[in-house]
UniProtKB/Swiss-Prot annotation:
GO cellular component: Cul2-RING ubiquitin ligase complex; nuclear body; nuclear membrane; nucleoplasm; nucleus
Keywords per UniProt: Kelch repeat, Nucleus, Repeat, Ubl conjugation, Ubl conjugation pathway
Gene Ontology BP annotations: proteasome-mediated ubiquitin-dependent protein catabolic process; protein ubiquitination; ubiquitin-dependent protein catabolic process via the C-end degron rule pathway
Main location: nucleus
Gene from which this protein is expressed: KLHDC2
Pathway in which this enzyme or protein is active: Protein modification; protein ubiquitination
GO molecular function: ubiquitin-like ligase-substrate adaptor activity
Effect of F182A: Impairs oligomerization of KLHDC2-ELOB-ELOC complex
Cleavable signal peptide: none
Membrane as UniProt keyword: no
Localization annotation: Nucleus
Kelch repeats: 31-85, 92-136, 148-207, 221-259, 271-311, 322-359
Effect of R236A: Does not affect ability to recognize truncated SELENOK with a diglycine (Gly-Gly) at the C-terminus. Abolished ability to recognize cleaved USP1 with a diglycine (Gly-Gly) at the C-terminus
Organism of origin: Homo sapiens
Name assigned to this protein: Kelch domain-containing protein 2
Length: 406
């Protein structure tokens, strides 16, 4: 469960309400780290991860695999949905994306080791219960691994790096064994710099022939897609947690290393990197080489090639192996993760808290809705004059008691 050996919205109508599914509305999901979270811009879907066993103390356990938690980014409400079908095993360190409201899940680490299985779940389904489907893809798959990254471009999912088993088939790229894994596992593992493409129309795996200087093998790094560039920052390789920044041109498959001007974030793994505009990435948290959890946030300006430290109110809330998703309202929603040294298992402080970072100016609609809510007593008699979809938004917000980050 560690970072090596520790290791535009489619329209202006309301999105799917998920009210028709068999569900259970609770306050929030359990605390966790190593989970996945993806977004359709209005909802954040959370699956998997693990937490400490509160009864036995020294043991970690994976969260229930059937549970899919959906966070409404507008109202701040959580909903739990119990999924069915080819449900993936409970895992940590998996890699997930959401494309056109379809969730794709690859890799991870479960109770029997690493996996390279691929799953999908269509959140647009009209069935009463959301169904997982395991896809038997064509071509040579990536090796079994966790803590890898992914870029989404056109009809392709492009996976990079990770920590796991030696590939069984010949692949392009470098694999470096972790010597310490020979002592504590019958299946030694290591880091890699492999690039694998999955075509989501044919479900076929392939590898591109890349040019330029590739990044070193790594795991627990962070990836983000902007245009035709797949960015990767940091991650762990052997005993170092790095702060290098690279991008892969997803048309030409050429690697480029970026040397930003001025100050840069310290090296880290288990951090998040989120695209927030066509020119900016948002970096938060992580874990340093000297095993310190981080609470700093940065924005990277692509056109200026520079990092800028981002001021925020959560400096006393470090997070590592958390998740971060961008909303349609210019916010980054951070969920879960660990607040201290994750490697001291019996003391790991896993979180289930939401941290909200406003990284873009709020829209006029959002500002107007907040004003209506602020002066609700004064304006209540005029609510029926609002368009139906805005009235729906106001009513939903009144039903929420989650004001974190506002």
């Amino acid at each position: 469960m560690a970072d090596g050996n520790e290791d535009l919205r489619a329209d202006d109508l309301p999105g799917p309400a998920f009210e028709s599914y068999e569900s259970m509305e609770l306050a929030c999901p359990a605390e966790r780290s190593g989970h996945v979270a993806v977004s359709d811009g209005r909802h954040m879907f959370v699956w998997g991860g693990y937490k400490s066993n509160q009864v036995r103390g020294l043991y970690d356990f994976y969260l229930p695999r059937e549970e899919l938690w959906i966070y409404n980014m507008e109202t701040g409400r959580w909903k739990k949905i119990n999924t069915e079908g080819d449900v993936p095993p409970s895992m940590s360190g998996s890699c997930a994306v959401c494309v056109d409201r379809v969730l794709y899940l690859f890799g991870g680490h479960h109770s029997r080791g690493n996996t390279n299985k691929f799953y999908m779940l269509d959140s647009r389904s009209t069935d009463r219960v959301l169904q997982w489907e395991r896809i038997d893809c064509q071509g040579i798959p990536p090796s079994s691994k966790d803590k890898l990254g992914v870029w989404v471009y056109k009809n392709k999912l492009i996976f990079f790096g990770g920590y796991g088993y030696l590939p069984e088939d010949k692949v392009l790229g470098t694999f470096e064994f972790d010597e310490t894994s020979f002592w504590n596992s019958s299946h030694p593992r290591g880091w890699n710099d492999h690039v694998h493409i999955l075509d989501t129309e044919t479900f076929t795996w392939s590898q591109p022939i890349t040019t330029g200087k590739a990044p070193s093998p790594r795991a627990a790094h962070a990836c983000a897609t902007v245009g035709n560039r797949g960015f990767v920052f940091g991650g762990r390789y052997r005993d170092a947690r790095m702060n290098d920044l690279h991008y892969l041109n997803l048309d030409t498959w050429e690697w480029n290393e970026l040397i930003p001007q001025g100050i840069c974030p310290v090296g880290r793994s288990w951090h998040s990197l989120t695209p927030v505009s066509s020119d900016h990435l948002f970096l938060f948290g992580g874990f340093t080489t000297d095993k310190q959890p981080l609470s700093d946030a940065w924005t990277y300006c692509i056109s200026k090639n520079e990092w800028i430290q981002f001021n925020h109110p959560y400096t006393e809330k470090p997070r590592l192996w958390h998740t971060a998703c961008a909303s349609d309202e210019g916010e980054v929603i951070v969920f879960g993760g660990c607040a201290n040294n994750l490697l001291v298992h019996h003391r790991a402080a896993h979180s289930n808290e939401i941290l909200i970072f406003s990284v873009q100016p709020k829209s006029l609609v959002r500002l107007s809705l907040e004003a209506v809510i602020c002066f609700k007593e004064m304006l209540a008699n005029s609510w029926n004059c609002l368009p139906k979809h805005l009235l729906h938004s106001v009513n939903q917000r009144f039903g929420s008691n989650n004001t974190s980050g506002s």
